[in-house]
Every structure is written in structure tokens, then in C-alpha cells.
Swiss-Prot record:
List of residues binding substrate: E35, H36, T37, D38, Y224
GO biological process terms, semicolon-separated: galactose metabolic process
Its biological purpose: Catalyzes the transfer of the gamma-phosphate of ATP to D-galactose to form alpha-D-galactose-1-phosphate (Gal-1-P).
EC number from the UniProt entry: 2.7.1.6
InterPro entries referenced in this protein's UniProt entry, alphabetically: Galactokinase (IPR000705), Galactokinase_bac (IPR022963), Galactokinase_CS (IPR019741), GalKase_N (IPR019539), GHMP_kinase_C_dom (IPR013750), GHMP_kinase_C_sf (IPR036554), GHMP_kinase_N_dom (IPR006204), GHMP_knse_ATP-bd_CS (IPR006203)
Subcellular location: Cytoplasm
Site positions for Transition state stabilizer: R29
Keyword entries, A-Z: ATP-binding, Carbohydrate metabolism, Cytoplasm, Galactose metabolism, Kinase, Magnesium, Metal-binding, Nucleotide-binding, Transferase
Superkingdom in the source lineage: Bacteria
Name the record gives this protein: Galactokinase
Keyword Nucleotide-binding listed: yes
Gene3D superfamilies found in the cross-reference section: 3.30.230.10, GHMP kinase, C-terminal domain (3.30.70.890)
Amino acid sequence: MTNLIKNVKDAFNSVLSYAPTHIVQAPGRVNLIGEHTDYNDGFVLPCAINYQTVVAAAKRDDNIVRVVSVDYGNETDEFDITQEITFQENKMWSNYIRGVVKCLIDRGYEFKGADISVSGNVPQGAGLSSSAALEVVIGQTFKELYNLNISQAEIALNGQQAENEFVGCNCGIMDQMISAEGNENHAMLLDCRSLETTAVSMPEDMSVVIINSNKKRGLVDSEYNTRREQCEEAARIFGVKALRDVTIEEFNAKAHELDEMVAKRARHVITENDRTEEAAKVLASGDMKRMAVLMAESHASMRDDFEITVSEVDTLVDIVKNVIGAEGGVRMTGGGFGGCIVALVPPMLVDEVKAAVEELYEAKTGLKESIYVCQATNGAGLVL
């Protein structure tokens, strides 16, 4: 993060010609287990990772917000918070910031303008929530600058609202919530219905290894929508609000009444919720052997019942599994059809995992992976 801090300070100084008063950060995240459970009112178990979006900022006496984007060649955006805040077709990055500020105002928070420079190292397009980190860091920045009486949960909800309503991209609450509320060396069990969060301690030195398959993700939106519709259909047949409300016993008793495809989709969600709740308990107790089993079962369920993995991702999981055995867990993470795997790896096996993947993955698939070795880190807050 040191480089990011230097970059945002330097950009602030050079473009705005004075020094910032505050440095604020918000992290990206990875979901350890609980996939496609969020829109079924279920449970997820993400952790914040030490790839962040960082802001240098200072208050202004007027109502102007000026933003410098370091990652877009110090491109700037400027808007007046007392005027209508509009969507910028030709400057997509700025809409996340405009949306967050607009939603804060709509929620009744009062503040004046700000000068902001922003940069991040959360890999974009890898499903590690670079957009949520940006939304949360902007909310956090206004909280810090103006001592706003806003909870971390509301900063998260405000960011989600900005993405859904202003940017126009549907997302659940997980990404913003873990970015806003994460704890070092902890994952977070999130109940996607009540939004209740529980910090779950992780083995102190466990590495969180994220490997991007770099498989281009085709069909994601249409397949995602189909899965969602199938889950909603299953919930209707069971007469419940969401699949969260169906036990595996109830499912087994009625599975024969469901269309075979719908039954497979429902079985994944119902068993994944059970796995996620159990994973929170076994992770906290340090039982990595059981965690390894739960993550393996999650991956198999995504592959066979939810059918969202691809051969390249399955290959990556197999390569890592062969190295770590029962010492850690590995599974696909994210929406599917490409993307990343996540592995909980004891530190002494990290180099071995990297070596095996570098030796075997490209040879088997023709694709070159990207590897990120992370730790579970704190959520958004003031750095300086």
C-alpha cells in the first residue's frame, strides 16, 4: 500500500498544487465459500484482502468535488454537489464517485466539497471487487473529512445503492460490506437476508492465494440470469420466499417434483448455505482438514449441480489440491464461467503451489495464470 499512498499524494500535490490532509483506504475481497447464495437470501464467507483502493483528500470551503484518477493518467472530474449530479458516459470511472456522493446526499448527510486523488491495485476484471472498494473508500473519505455519523454498514449500503441505481449495475451487498467492515486475520460470515455480520477468526498465518485462470468469461450475464430464475422457480414450488428457507431434508422429500435442472440448481444453493455456516465454525476452530472438505464439496457442487465452472478452472483447482492435500482448501470463487480460484494455503506451501501452477497450468490449458498471495486484512478506514 506504500506505493499507492505515495502515488495519490504525489498526484494530489502536482495536479491540485497543495498537500492532502487525509489518506483513506478500502480493500478488495475474495469469497472463501458461499457461491450464488447471496441472491437466495443465504450466507457468504468473504475476507478483505491486502489489495486496496487509496484516496488522498482534503476539505473544500465550497460545494465543488474535484477528483484526480491516478490510474487514468491523472484524468480529472469536477462537479457541484448543490446541482444535479449527472452520469458521465465518457468517463466511466467517475460515475462510481458521483454515485456515492449523490446517494450520501439523498440519505440526508450534509457536507461541503472535497479535493480527492484516487488509485488502486485491486486487479480489475478478476472478480475481486475493485468497484466496491472504490465506492466504499469514497464513502469512508466523506465520513473522515466531515465526521459524518454514518456506520460502516451504511457506507456499504450506500455504495451498493450507487452501483445499482446510479452506475446501473446490479450487485448484492457482500462486496461493499466486507470492504467496509473487514477485520485483519478474520473472514466475515454475512447473512444476506438480515445483513447481520459475524467476524470469524482465521488461522493466524494462513495465506489466501487467489489465482486468476485468465479464461475469458463468456455468457456470464445470460447464464447468471438463468440460474437466478431457476432458483426463484424452485423457491416458488417450495412455497418459500427464497431457497434459504428450505432444509436439505425438505428438498430431498420433494426433489422428484422438480424439473431435473431446477432440482440441481436448488440442491447447490441449499447445500452451499449449510456448508458456509459450518465453514465459519470450523475456520474459527482452526480445523483446516474439515475446511478443505467443505471447500472441495463446494467446488464439486458448482461444477456438477450449478454447472458454472469451466475446464480451465477445474484444472487449476486440481493442481493446487494435489499440492496442499488436507492442509488447506481450494475452490472456484466468484460468478463462474472463468475467473478465479481461491485457496487457503499454509505459508510453507505457498511457493510449492506457485511452482506447480506455473509449471502445469499453461502446459495443460494454453493460458497463463495470474497469482495473488494475500492476507485477510482490515476493512475501510483512515490510514494517515
